[in-house]
Amino acid sequence: MAAILLMLSAILGAAPAATVSAEERPTFDHAATSEKIVALTFDADMTPGMLRELKGGKVASWYNEKVIEALRQRHASATLFLTGLWIETYPDATKQLAADPLFELGNHSYSHGAFHSPCYNLFPIPQSKQAAEVQTTDDLLKQYAGTYKKYFRFPGLCSDAQAMKTVEDQGYTVIGGDIDGADAFEKSPKWVAADVVSHVRPGSIVVLHMHGGPNAPATANALPDIITKLRAEGYSFVKVSDLLKLPAGEPVKHPAVARQIAGSPPNVAPAFFPFWHFFGR
């Protein structure tokens, strides 16, 4: 029901949702503003299964540099959420991204497991190991990035009260998103671009992916259209840190339930349905 209401709100051009306090919101999903600003965010997922595919030669790379090139060429700011396994695999890239003022880096756990289950088919992270998932990646960000934001995005956007406390106790602000870019496994850049552009509203946080490969093959080629069309509509691109200076909009209700639709084409689902469950192996 929440997803349906979100879709209707986007279609009808409803006004931004009422603001809520930091204490009331489980995540920062978007800013309550009438200003045409939007934050593009990109997750660099890496599960143990993805790492095995890389080492076994099944996948050439889990770093889609064309995503970064598209952003740089168009001077579009972005916030990048990196998993610890991804940082360990691409330490030089992490350093380069951290040094680029166009970007800011955040924490996306160490191994991209579920902090709350069921969460699609992501493998569960036991409660006793969740703090280490956050801290290990924090240590890696310190080592390879130096400069980073204390922002955390839950894998699959799945969490519960205990997981939230674990993350917040380590000094992190939890970041979600109100627009699922639906680029996971989608092969059509035009479809990804059209989906994002049609749902963006002032203060939106768009969730996309930067690991490429078979899991997110269309993202880089969708970005030129996304950036060009949103700028034509008067939008400018900001980082999550810019949105956090504004009041928070009402949180988006992200379903934390298992769904087995791997046999369905990605583009049959609404824009607000997340596909991160495909990444768990």
Where on the chain are the PLM-derived regions?
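Acidic-and-aromatic substrate-binding clefts and catalytic sites of carbohydrate-active enzymes
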Residues: 48, 58-59, 82-91, 153-160, ...
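A cross-domain feature marking catalytic cores of carbohydrate-active enzymes
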Residues: 42-44, 82-84, 107-109, 154-156, ...
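Extracytoplasmic/secreted proteins, especially bacterial periplasmic and envelope-associated proteins
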Residues: 37, 62-66, 89-92, 129-132, ...
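Accessory recognition modules or surfaces
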Residues: 101, 187-189, 196-210, 215-218, ...
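CE4/NodB-like, metal-dependent polysaccharide N-deacetylase domain
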Residues: 68-82, 104, 122-158, 165, ...
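N-terminal pre-catalytic segment of deacetylase/amide-hydrolase enzymes
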Residues: 1-62, 94-95, 225-229, 233-281
